[in-house]
Amino acid sequence: MAERGAPEAAGARIPDQVLTTAARLFSELGYDEVTTQIIADACGVDAAVVAGEYGGKGRVFLAVLERLSRERMDYLSPAASAFTPDAEGMVRLIDRYLDYCLDHPELPSIWMHRWMSDATDFPDLEPRYGTPPIILMSELMGEALDDEVDPDLFTWQIVWAVHSFTRGGIVGADGVRRRADDLGVRKRFRRSLHQMARRAAAR
């Protein structure tokens, strides 16, 4: 059973380096496969410290999501505040989301694990941490999209594409996987997102 409690309170007791290490573990293995002992070993502390002082695996997980989700919203804020209801406004907002995910691949990866039924001990992760930026983006881009385009589905298409690209890159016709750190592939992917936005925009 997952440990419950406010992630903010737990996070206040957890050192930043522990949250950083735990984020990497959760992104690589998923919540269900990470144990208290794995966190302790990776952080160089005793398992009793993780279970006691840090509140256990569940609270560490919530604290990781709290921090990354807050950072994501803070990062999106300038583009959201300066949003213009046109194609270029959408491009700037999408770029901002993509840039955050490229710089912080742990969060997209954690959510992809979640989409495959990870961390089911926590039924409310989406409204608490997952959907707020997506709702924001959908509401903003809805002002710019053509009337025939569904804002929610369009936004989710962007999110799915960005998370999948950040996690796995693309596999070309030659069968070679090219990751998101390949600058050439990254440029192609960004251009493709821009094309989607411009074609879906009303103006």
Tell me what each language-model feature is.
Residues 67, 110-114, 157, 161:
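Short acidic/histidine-centered micro-motifs embedded in hydrophobic/aromatic stretches
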Residues 73-77, 119-145, 152-153, 187, ...:
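Amphipathic alpha-helical packing segments from all-alpha helical-bundle domains
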Residues 48, 62-92, 130, 134-140:
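Amphipathic alpha-helical linker/stalk segments
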Residues 63, 77-107, 145-158:
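Hydrophobic alpha-helical connector segments
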Residues 102-124, 168-176:
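Amphipathic alpha-helical segments used for helix-helix packing
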Residues 1-13, 24, 203:
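N-terminal intrinsically disordered/low-complexity leader segments
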Residues 13-17, 21, 25-59, 63:
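Helix-turn-helix
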Residues 2-3, 134-143, 147-148, 161-203:
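C-terminal peripheral helix-coil segments that are non-catalytic and often amphipathic
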